[in-house]
């Protein structure tokens, strides 16, 4: 058995994906070649109409470079809902109706894939049911009773968006489509989605007692942000062409990646398209540029015959993000004051009344009327080294604020690790992180029994 993402040796050939840069170079060379052919046709007297139309349709998909610096947004978008998200922090950098729930078609399959990767194994045998085989186009044309490796079906799912494949995977992982939908919705909540309801694993327009199948551009971006952290998911969605067979080897298949955005920019690292009558054209993508990760989410981005709208919108959002956001570490070490503790003593320090312990200077500061010194404790922020290295995409002029809330005084007893405050990092009204401040040691309460024991100990020792 092997985990998904590992390469399994079989008798047939697999063509794994090109690198992002090589795909981009190939696209540019192909475009140049077609342009040369068009020019040659004109020179020789041939109209070259078909070639001109082909080139025109490709060029129109790629918007002209514009200066997006210091703009309020990417300009007009075709999509009804759109989000540009910081793929690392989850912060929404731009949104247009980003929190409005809409049908999301085959972008649903991002969730289907990630659940299969987490719950299944690449060598799992997946049996095709009558229900799976009867799914509508687009489909691989699976037949009832056939068996496939789960890994192979994931390439069919993500490269060509086959609906029958999605149902076969769902029934294998969740026992049924309904059982898998429950898993999908639970995972969505775990990721942080707030207005998502899944009914099917393939995204076909559907509804159940919980409502219609839908999500928001913001939730979809969160799901993609989560998915691209999985190396196997990235490997699958970056693969250009893939070949496989059923378990018996009798039926052979080849699938080609339908995510054309991979060829339009070297920044694209993953993506999934979708279309239904209710959803329109949808798209979700992940892009990386200079260690910045951008997630692009588009819902209702045109209806036939406007398949190219999603590419234009995606490129606009990407260019806007690249021009306006830089990466910055936002940790700030706050100065935490010592906190006085009433009616307590720090036995671990060996302090005597009114005297300062040389090993812990500054802990006993004043005499009280009781003959005992006030005890001061320090706070410790519960943040790891990785927490202190967190980064976020910021626009010019944006500032992260660090706010410390701490108890002004405490009353004994105090236990080590007891919460005594909180540090909050914010960007405007958006709270990025909260970290507890805890007591650095135990403080014992001074009682009559403690006094008696103290007198007895001092007298006999």
What are these regions (language model features)?
Residues 39, 155, 259-263:
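Short, hydrophobic/aliphatic alpha-helical segments
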Residues 211-461:
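Domain-terminus/edge residues, biased toward the C-terminal soluble/receptor-binding domains
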Residues 2-19:
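Short, Lys/Arg-enriched N-terminal segments with co-localized hydrophobic residues
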Residues 23-24, 100, 150, 448, ...:
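Structural motif marking the loop-to-transmembrane transition
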Residues 6, 43-231:
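Active-site-adjacent loops and short helices of periplasmic peptidoglycan-processing enzymes
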Residues 22-45:
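Sec-dependent N-terminal signal peptides of Gram-positive bacterial secreted proteins and lipoproteins
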